[in-house]
Each structure stands twice: as structure tokens, then as C-alpha cells.
Amino acid sequence: MTLEEIKTTVLYIQGLQALWKEDYNAEKIGDYTFGIVCRDYNTTDELWEVINELQFMGEGEEWEKTKEEVETLIQEKLGIRICDPISILSYTINLFIKQLTSDFSTNSLVLSFIEQTKELITYQEYTLALENLLKSLLEKYIFIPRDTLAILDNIEDTQIQRLQASLWRV
């Protein structure tokens, strides 16, 4: 998955979450989704399947989906719970860890940091887990590939952003 695909997925879900707060409106969801199509973002196959199913909502009864159907579709295709604000954070951190594991598959020190992080994630401590992982990487001056580190651009936590900025300089 490319960085642009990750950012598109996060942007799309954040937009849907904002629409959810206004109350469920199929036509608005269809319009918003169609706007994403018009911008020609790079998407994953899974996100494209979601977009294809939702872009015509509000255009007629045959395209309509209930709130629950949309939530289920997104959960099944993307693994993101639209009503759960922590879901995007979880999604982003899990992608970062997956890519980091791939980048450092032979580095036992980094892999041990990742295992410690996974233990905290088990307890839903996403921000703390990521913060600890980034601090450990920074303390050991471990260079993280730019594309991998950029996955975290979507996280809006000041401490995480500071640690990420410090890791850019390693």
C-alpha cells in the first residue's frame, strides 16, 4: 500500500466521520464519495470497492444503503469502524507497524520494540504504544525509511508529531 493510498483512505474515512456527526444522510455520503472519485486519488482496491458502492447514493432507491449497511461495508472492506474515532488511529498504527516489520525483518532490536508495542495495542493503548515505539527507535538512532515514517502524517497527536519530526532527522 502506498503512502498516497493510505492518506486517501484516512481522508475519506475522516470525511465520512464528519458526515456521521451531522446525522446520517445517504445523499450527502453519495455526493462526498463522488467528489473523491472526481479528484482521482490513488486508492486501494478495497477503498475503490467501497467508493463504487457508495458514490451513487441519493441518486435513486436502487443505490440506497442504510447507515448500518454502510458501516458494515466499510468494516468488511477496510477494517475500519466508522463510528469509532480510535479506528483511524488503530488503522494507521497497524499499517505503520506492518511496514516497519517488513523494513526491519532482520533487525532483532527493532522487532523487539515492535513486540512490546503490540502488547500495549492489545489493551487499546494505541497512542502510548506508538509513542513508546518511536521513543525506542529514536533512542537507538534507528533510521526509518521516509515512506514508512510518513504513514504517521495522519496522526494528530502533538507528542507523536514531535517524535516523528525528530525521527525525520535521524
What do these predicted ranges mean?
Residues 5, 42, 121-125:
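Structural motif
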Residues 25-67:
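Acidic, low-complexity, intrinsically disordered interaction modules
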Residues 8-11, 15-18, 49-52, 56-59, ...:
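Extended, non-membrane alpha-helical segments enriched in charged/polar residues
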Residues 21-40, 104-119:
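A short, compositionally biased N-terminal segment around positions ~18-40 that is enriched
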Residues 5, 28, 35, 73, ...:
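Generic short N-terminal amphipathic or hydrophobic helices
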